[in-house]
Design a protein with these regions (language model features):
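Repetitive beta-architecture junctions, highlighting loop-to-beta-strand starts
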Residues: 38-39, 98-102, 163-165, 222-224
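Residue-level detector of Asp-centered blade-edge/turn motifs that repeat once per structural unit
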Residues: 23-25, 69-70, 130-131, 200-201, ...
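Residue position within the beta-strands of beta-propeller blades
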Residues: 28-32, 73-77, 134-138, 203-208, ...
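Multi-bladed beta-propeller domains
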Residues: 2-14, 43-61, 103-122, 169-194, ...
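Loop/turn-rich, solvent-exposed surfaces of beta-rich toroidal or solenoidal domains
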Residues: 190-229, 239-262
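Conserved beta-strand position repeated across blades of beta-propeller domains
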Residues: 20-22, 66, 127, 197, ...
Length: 262
């Protein structure tokens, strides 16, 4: 990890994160810079450019990204994010979104448009299917009882956040999305599903499942599950899970390997 604090201070320090590549290649990629002179750097056909994805109609700049596999498009979540620090719980840190939506960035036209922005839903973690014709994402129903003190209420009710996995069809020619379809209903079992990842052959959905929230890397109860999208059967991957957190998983380009953070 680059120790940038060795050559900077609290005024000009930076966090560089959320690297994302197009279809396992290296010509097109993006990463975010936080703090001083922050923004998103997009490398398009080998040319790097810094962009500001925040508009008057979005919550924030782009956060969690997913490149379209063939087109110059990136789906992002936009998030108003905070942290809570617990003294009694064994999970000492919780990362929480008070609001979140899904947007689409058209690189060639430098245009941002909303994909899903429902006031009572916390939409996050978009991910394209390998054929580029479906966008998967997570969303949790959350209705504030106090319309003013959102941050305080989220800290009090953070265990109420239960994400399901959804998808929308996508027309690559017209760049339009279809209706939202439920793929995996975690909330019915009072659980939360995050980080949908589709295998390169398009058959399997890999995701993390935990008790609540969207930041399962901090949650010891989070495990990796897989759904066969042909018959919609879901099972826990017993041989790769432990009694600690499993999350932030990815497929290899040939679909024969899975990498998991534990």
């Amino acid at each position: 990890i680059y120790g940038n604090m060795l050559v900077s201070n609290d005024l000009n320090g930076q966090c560089i994160n959320c690297h994302s590549y197009q279809n396992y290649g290296t010509n097109n990629m993006q990463f975010h810079m936080r703090q001083a002179m922050g923004g998103t750097v997009i490398v398009n056909d080998g040319v790097a450019k810094k962009v500001n994805l925040k508009t008057d109609s979005t919550l924030s700049a782009g956060v969690y990204p997913s490149w379209h596999p063939t087109l110059k498009l990136i789906a992002y979540s936009t998030n108003l994010t905070g942290q809570a620090f617990h003294t009694k719980s064994s999970a000492k840190i919780d990362v929480q979104d008070t609001k979140s939506d899904i947007i689409l960035y058209d690189i060639e036209n430098n245009e941002v448009s909303n994909i899903s922005a429902i006031d009572t839903e916390l939409e996050v973690f978009p991910w394209w299917a390998p054929d580029g014709k479906t966008l998967y994402f997570c969303s949790a129903f959350f209705e504030y009882k106090d319309t003013v003190a959102n941050e305080t209420e989220m800290i009090d009710r953070y265990t109420d956040v239960k994400h399901n996995i959804y998808r929308k069809s996508f027309d690559p020619q017209n760049k339009t999305f279809g209706e939202t379809e439920l793929v995996f209903d975690a909330a019915k079992d009072s659980l939360s599903a995050t980080l949908p990842r589709i295998s390169p052959d398009g058959r399997y959905l890999l995701f993390a499942l935990g008790e609540h929230g969207c930041f399962h890397i901090w949650h010891a109860d989070a495990d990796i599950y897989i759904t066969d999208l042909q018959n919609m059967q879901t099972r826990k991957l017993e041989n790769i899970n432990s009694d600690q957190a499993e999350s932030y998983h990815s497929w290899s380009s040939n679909g024969r390997w899975i990498i998991v953070s534990s």
